[in-house]
Amino acid sequence: MLNQVEVLREEYVEGYVVQMWRRNPSNAPVIEVFTEDNLEEGIIPEYVTANDDTFDRIVDAVEFGYLEELELV
């Protein structure tokens, strides 16, 4: 199944959804932030370095109101 999205981690935080996903097993995972009502279009760019530590830091940033700073990256 080419281009099938596999969600590796997902967390709902303060009206947002933080997802770590990849298109297929040979692709590196990416992290993206969405609003809960629109899971089709991310509100910040996909993060290239997608690992558990980066995921946790992004979840914390969203939870503590630093979403604007993430958008500048």
UniProtKB/Swiss-Prot annotation:
The name this protein goes by in its record: Putative gene 60 protein
Organism: Bacillus phage SP01
